[in-house]
Design a protein with these regions (language model features):
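N-terminal alpha/beta PP-like core and its mobile active-site loop of ThDP/TPP-dependent enzymes
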Residues: 1-111
Length: 111
């Protein structure tokens, strides 16, 4: 079992039924295999706003879940995330990433 499979399984066990996303994240295929419905968006902020709406419409049950690509994708989502944070909307945000070995910066450091 790798990291994405592990995360997908935990999300399923926690009751996640759908996840909004921008189509550039390795987790998308794994959540699909677990029976979680990925809902694709053309922009990260739209995906965040949909997850926000999903959480708000649940009547206090559950939370919104959104994933996007790293770097610019995470930056594009900040406006929607700020609004959700300001309104205390429960949301899980999973920005993607890439292996440290692919950064081409030696030595590789991780905080």
């Amino acid at each position: 079992m790798n990291g994405t499979q592990f995360i997908a399984r935990i999300l399923k066990e926690e009751g996640v039924e759908q996840m909004t996303c921008f189509p550039s994240n390795a987790l998308i295929e794994e959540v699909s295999k677990e029976g979680i419905r990925p809902v694709m968006f053309r922009h990260e902020r739209g995906a965040v706003m949909a997850a926000d709406g999903y959480a708000r419409s649940g009547g206090g049950e559950g939370f919104g879940t959104v994933m996007m690509q790293h770097a610019a994708g995470a930056e594009n989502s900040v406006g929607g995330l700020s609004q959700a944070f300001g309104d205390n909307v429960p949301m899980l945000v999973l920005p993607g990433g890439y292996p440290l070995a692919e950064r081409n910066i030696r030595p590789n450091f991780a905080a």
